[in-house]
Amino acid sequence: MATRIPKTPSTPPAQKPAGDDGDSVVLERRPQKTAPPQMYQVVMLNDDYTPMEFVIVVLQEYFNKDRETATQIMLKIHLDGRGVCGVYSRDLAATKVNQVMEAAHQAGHPLQCVSEPIA
């Protein structure tokens, strides 16, 4: 007796949707590559009038630095004329600068703080 090979089921022909003339174009969505946001560093500038203790308190209160880290940053500001307090997005950096400037103004100190884009 001969062995029979089973028939493979035939696939039905592809059907076009009604009204499709075969000239359709399929667009594929490519994932967009977004660049990370520009980051800014908040920098405090040295002056001869603002007490060192005030700078330490500002670093602790507005930048969440512990006492030791705040003291190190304060000494860098004092010795180098400027020191980086933190790195943030543009809006958050601007907010931090405003908070520091307002606190200095309220306390009667000429402390200056700026934000700079990181290259």
Swiss-Prot record:
Report the function annotation for this chain. Answer: Involved in the modulation of the specificity of the ClpAP-mediated ATP-dependent protein degradation.
Encoding gene per record: clpS
The disulfide bonds in this chain are: none
Q: Which stretches does the entry tag as region Disordered? A: 1-33
Instruction: State the family it belongs to.
Output: Belongs to the ClpS family.
Assembly and partners are described as: Binds to the N-terminal domain of the chaperone ClpA.
According to UniProt, the name of this protein is ATP-dependent Clp protease adapter protein ClpS
- UniProt xrefs under PANTHER family: ATP-DEPENDENT CLP PROTEASE ADAPTER PROTEIN CLPS, ATP-DEPENDENT CLP PROTEASE ADAPTER PROTEIN CLPS1, CHLOROPLASTIC
Q: Which InterPro entries match?
A: ClpS (IPR022935), ClpS_core (IPR003769), Ribosomal_bL12_C/ClpS-like (IPR014719)
Reading the lineage from the top rank, the first entry is Bacteria
